From Swiss-Prot:
GO cellular component, one term: plasma membrane
Gene (UniProt): dctA
Pfam family, one: SDF
Name used for this protein in its record: C4-dicarboxylate transport protein
Species: Paraburkholderia xenovorans (strain LB400)
Coiled coil: none
Amino acid sequence: MKKPIHKVLYVQVIVAIIIGIGLGHFYPDLAVDMKPLGDGFIKLIKMVIGPIIFCTVVTGIAGMEDMKKVGRVGGKALLYFEIVSTFALVLGLIATHVLKPGVGFNIDPATLDGKAVASYAAKAHGQTTVDFLMHIIPDTLVSAFAQGEILQILLIALLFGAVLATAGEKGKVVTGFIDGLSHVLFGIVRIITKLAPIGAFGAMAFTIGKYGIGSLLPMLKLIGTFYLTSVVFVVVVLGIIARAVGFNILRFVAYIKEEMLIVLGTSSSEAALPQLMLKLERLGCSRSVVGLVVPTGYSFNLDGTNIYMTMAVLFIAQATNTDLTWTQQLTLLAVTMLTSKGASGVTGAGFITLAATLAVVPTIPLSGMVLILGIDRFMSECRALTNIVGNGVATVVVSAWEKELDRSKLNAALRGDVAIKEPAGV
């Protein structure tokens, strides 16, 4: 028996987003005060992300008979991430050259006030590649969870799971406890997810109330170019990959529509991480692959952020009439491939990563970031949506590559004609 339409989550989220836009447009002062609703929802989700990743990865690895499989799955995932990320970067480069969203602005960099982006630049300068790698190692076991550092938690879970896999019967007792804990955590997620419409309303009302729909008008060409390129990437690039694996990308997008609407409302792909992991297990992906690929992808497979990075940098170059040679543009791609690894699923992280890229490519004025500061919040939604679809597809691909994809579940779930039971441990 189907739920009444007013009780369906994605319908509630859509209505909440529309109401949020209306409140932000007509009552901006009141709408800005709704910010705690969005922030509170994201904090509730982030509260359980670390423990869920830990439990999922530990039980997945502990259940693997061959520990070489962990390295194999991780290696395949990273290879896939780098290949697809390169496609995203190149597509952003090509689209900006073809559509030229920055041509005609003729802005003198000397007239730009860089104070507005000084804080982002400071954060960007504060971390090198070595710092990023060292940051993966937590100061203590507790600090990783306390600070919600996904990569640090993933490292702890990998070590924990590897030890449990070789600990015999004693290890099985601990694994059983952690598996039981995951039941509780996903139960908490189900409760929190019911609050998604409130969070989406608060975040959208704040965004429109603070920045206003009118702030979009001068930059509509850049926004349109970015959204169009992201759609092309999902439909064409990810569509071809999905077809090669044996599923339809549009049906996959429809399957995760609730998670995408949560992301749309909050502008944070992390807000839907627990639900995405649950949906992918229901889709037929093995729990061990989901546990390894999804958390890793949130730092290493940010397709939307990659498109945004090359497009934003070239837009600033076009707007300030800064000529770039092809060598400089190829260097830009290489630099972006590295700096984008530091972007997480948190709102605004992409802008900090952009500052890091411009800091390494001094030909383009860093003060040019001021041009897109006002609209970055509106582009954040598209970045997050593309990221979540990319990570979902990556998980299905790696599962199929490992021959751990249940095709019957996949086909039934995407058709929507069979009620899929929740996977074990959920």
